[in-house]
Amino acid sequence: HYGDFRFRQIEILYNMARMDSAEAHNWLKDNLFQQRVDARKKQEYKAKFKGQERADWKEIQTEWMKYCLMLKYRDNALFRKDLFACRGKLPVEDATKTNYASNLFWGARLIELEGKKYYFGCNVLGKLLAQLRDNGGKLEYKLPEDLHLFGKPVINL
């Protein structure tokens, strides 16, 4: 949860920070907080608030993801259990069945090369998950001071 708001998926909170608009934040809250995120709703959100994306989104998205992952770690015992179950291994965010270019940043796609299978991609999410697990739920992050949700500064963790 974030403050008084509970949501089913951390992806909702992650997407809130993409837009610099209290109206966009409230739309997400009203439309997605208690539902699973699906690609159609995400595209609707992006289209509805096109032009309101933070100018620095590409620069801050990884820092914001760290924040979101720490919240999930704090609030979700099953998530913590799953992370510790793969101790010593690097989690892979499998993007094999997706077509979004950003998924090769956050994850990796399984490819075959000369008869061997490899994951190709940056797998930033997998690396962050390993750091989160290995650091007891803490990640260093730096967010801009003007990052607000629902018109208020982001809650410190």
Ranges and model annotations:
Residues 1-157:
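Charged, low-complexity intrinsically disordered segments
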